[in-house]
């Protein structure tokens, strides 16, 4: 199907390639079964990161980590609900951990 939009408005960057750690999968299952966390909101943040269209909106408080987690990034899904991910130069995004501060840093 063709579009009447100018070519510039039809261009987009490719979505990022995605991977996840085994621990991330375990975190997802644990949090999903607990019923305390909005997993749909987590999926929304993940899709924004994968889409690669723009930085996450400010409400996610996306930032680089330091110390043992240097090289990783963290965003706040809501309250004390976090997503840790690794954004590599190759364009690969690896979802590494998710949970509360206590789950991830203590």
What label would you give each PLM region?
Residues 1-79, 88-93, 102-106:
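Basic, Lys/Arg-enriched alpha-helical interface segments
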